[in-house]
């Protein structure tokens, strides 16, 4: 309920949002036992404003020099700047904060320099070479300053006069900087245009990693055979392209924040006598000796073209293994820290991808193009440090503990929950006692019940052209993925005054009645609610992601001097149709936004349905 959408989900429609004086009512006051999750959504919508204005700067410059034939020297410089200001304000009528104004100004500057030398040459029109070497330097600087205050005399100035706050909070500032340096080289070789070989190597140095582990070394190579260029393929006129390829390469990830390997201090104030004295204390994140997260990948594929490229097929098989995987790990409170980032082990991904494209019909007045893709990926945790399981993010909304786990031999972030056995003779929820000790223990009575990763994903893109009309649609699908519907647990929180759906009343267990079809426990204060497979649902879906219709005006008939190149009138819609068995609002969810905690739906804001119309003019 901390977000506006969460408040709308959680507040019962039976609650009146205003008191007898016409002021916003704190919905938690209806019952003394009401959950902290319940907030007045109208108050949050009308009496709070949150605005971010971002100015972006993008500058690129390059210099090319060709001293001799085939030799190219290129140096380039790029600057990307982001200047953002966030303003948040809650009015004097807002009942959940004391009339608060927040201002946060963030500035990020990213510069990159690339110096690249390439040399192309051939021998006897048989052997062709392309040699490249270079150096890149990237630097990012981030600065922010935040200030806030509350208890203002008037709402007129909102965040534009923090000095008028009755209570001014201590301002805060933040600074970070990271640097990435790279040396790279590549050789491309072609024999008769049919046999292709590529070899490359790069060395990356990142300031984010520990002192002795800042440099990572990443080789790669690939070979390919253009079978369609062979003389014996001339008799197969329908085959316009056939290319076989295989490759191997390593890449590195810098997906950690700066200074994660250093023992940082945080600041605060404590009361000493009549004064607040500033102090320093260790950060809540324990620093580790971190090294590069590295992914090694094998790839084999084939590219096919038929009927002068009107039909194109691309198929790939890949195997990826990521070692020294970086992940946040919770620490026991006795350590004095809450968490740490650690190289926890290795995971693998292997799968196949298929892409089929076709220009089915192409003539003056009518055209039909189709594109279909399907992909299967299998994810597996190969190894963990000391072989120990790692639990995912802890939720405390309705149950207790975490919902996901990282375990050797299982998918990353698999659902790790209790096994629901239905309702007992008293109408209460019951669970399977896995180890038979008569108690429910987090570590011994839970099991892996599902995975948020799909068996396969697929998509269909269709484009139809008739004279000056264009019609396009894109279908997107996911099959076999599970969703943990944490929002559904709200329907079991009987004793907290939460918004509970009408079906609970009709489908709940009742004393003295036939309860063979009861789906919900007896309506009372439920004390045995746990994260169980009861809340795991099939998250498969097929979605009409985009559909559009456009008309191109025949400008060539009345723009005689070619000053007008085109006028296009269009209407398009996004996410207007979704077919799914998932009972929640949207099956395409991830409350925490990471692979370790993917597929958890907790009052998640759904994908927006949009309808847009416009005119595009080209001169």
Residue ranges and their predicted role:
Residues 182, 216-218:
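Transmembrane beta-barrel architecture of outer membranes
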Residues 546-579:
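C-terminal structured "cap/appendage" subdomains that terminate the fold
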Residues 207-212:
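Solvent-exposed loop/turn segments connecting transmembrane beta-strands
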Residues 451-484:
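Glycine-rich, aromatic-lined ligand/substrate-binding cores of catalytic
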Residues 65-67, 79, 121, 137, ...:
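Short beta-strand segments enriched in hydrophobic/aromatic residues
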Residues 61-65, 115-119, 133, 185-189, ...:
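Residues on the lipid-exposed face of transmembrane beta-strands in outer-membrane beta-barrel proteins
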Residues 197-206:
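Transmembrane beta-strand segments that form the barrel wall of outer-membrane beta-barrel proteins
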Residues 1-56, 74-181, 229-297, 308, ...:
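Surface-exposed loop/interface segments of Gram-negative outer-membrane beta-barrel transport/assembly proteins
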């Amino acid at each position: 309920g901390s977000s506006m959408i969460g408040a709308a989900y959680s507040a019962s429609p039976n609650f009146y949002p205003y008191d007898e004086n016409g002021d916003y009512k704190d919905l938690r006051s209806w019952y003394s036992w009401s959950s902290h999750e319940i907030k007045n959504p109208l108050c949050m919508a009308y009496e709070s404003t949150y605005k971010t204005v971002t100015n972006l700067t993008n500058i690129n410059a390059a210099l090319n020099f060709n001293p001799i034939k085939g030799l190219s020297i290129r140096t380039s410089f790029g600057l990307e700047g982001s200047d953002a200001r966030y303003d948040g304000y809650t009015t004097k009528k807002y009942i959940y904060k004391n009339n608060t104004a927040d201002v946060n100004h963030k500035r990020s500057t990213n510069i990159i320099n690339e110096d690249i030398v390439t040399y192309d040459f051939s021998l006897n029109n048989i052997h062709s070479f392309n040699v490249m070497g270079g150096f890149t330097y990237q630097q990012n600087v981030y600065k922010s300053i935040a200030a806030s205050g509350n208890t203002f005399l008037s709402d007129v100035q909102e965040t534009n006069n923090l000095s008028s706050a009755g209570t001014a909070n201590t301002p805060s500032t933040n600074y970070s900087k990271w640097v990435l340096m790279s040396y790279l080289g590549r050789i491309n070789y072609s024999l008769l245009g049919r046999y292709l070989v590529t070899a490359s190597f790069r060395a990356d140095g990142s300031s984010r990693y520990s002192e002795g582990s800042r440099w990572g070394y990443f080789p790669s190579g690939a070979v390919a055979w253009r079978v369609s260029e062979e003389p014996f393929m001339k008799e197969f006129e329908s085959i316009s392209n056939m290319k076989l390829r295989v490759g191997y390469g390593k890449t590195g990830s810098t997906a950690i924040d700066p200074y994660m390997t250093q023992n940082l201090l945080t600041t605060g104030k404590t009361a000493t006598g009549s004064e607040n004295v500033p102090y320093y204390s260790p950060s809540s994140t324990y620093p580790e000796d971190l090294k590069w997260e590295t992914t090694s990948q094998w790839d084999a594929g084939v590219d096919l073209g038929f009927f002068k490229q009107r039909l194109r097929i691309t198929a790939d098989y890949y195997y990826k293994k990521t070692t020294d995987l970086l992940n946040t790990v919770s620490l026991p409170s006795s350590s004095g820290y809450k968490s740490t980032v650690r190289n926890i082990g290795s995971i693998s991904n292997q799968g196949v991808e298929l892409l089929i494209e076709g220009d089915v019909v192409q003539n003056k007045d009518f055209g039909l193009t189709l594109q279909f893709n399907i992909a299967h990926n299998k994810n597996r945790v190969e190894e963990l440090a000391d072989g120990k399981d790692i639990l995912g993010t802890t939720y405390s909304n309705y149950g207790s503990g975490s919902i996901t786990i990282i375990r050797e031999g299982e998918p990353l972030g698999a659902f790790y929950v209790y096994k629901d056995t239905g309702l007992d003779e008293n109408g209460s929820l019951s669970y399977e006692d896995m180890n038979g000790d008569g108690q429910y223990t987090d570590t011994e009575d839970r099991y892996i019940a599902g995975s948020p990763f799909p068996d396969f994903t697929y998509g269909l893109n269709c484009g139809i052209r008739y004279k000056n009309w264009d019609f396009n649609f894109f279908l997107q699908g996911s099959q076999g993925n599970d969703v943990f519907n944490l929002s559904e647990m709200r329907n079991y929180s009987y004793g907290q005054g939460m918004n509970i759906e009408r079906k609970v009343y009709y489908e709940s267990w009742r004393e003295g009645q036939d309860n063979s079809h009861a789906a919900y426990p007896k309506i009372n204060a439920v004390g045995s609610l746990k994260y169980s497979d009861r809340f795991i649902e099939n998250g498969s879906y097929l979605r009409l992601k985009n559909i559009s219709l456009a008309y191109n005006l025949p400008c060539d008939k009345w723009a005689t001097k070619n000053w007008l190149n085109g006028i296009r009138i269009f209407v398009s819609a996004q996410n207007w149709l979704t077919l799914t068995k998932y009972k929640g609002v949207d099956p395409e969810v991830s409350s925490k936004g990471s692979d370790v905690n993917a597929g958890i739906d907790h009052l998640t804001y759904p994908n927006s349905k949009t309808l847009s119309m416009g005119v595009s003019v080209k001169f």
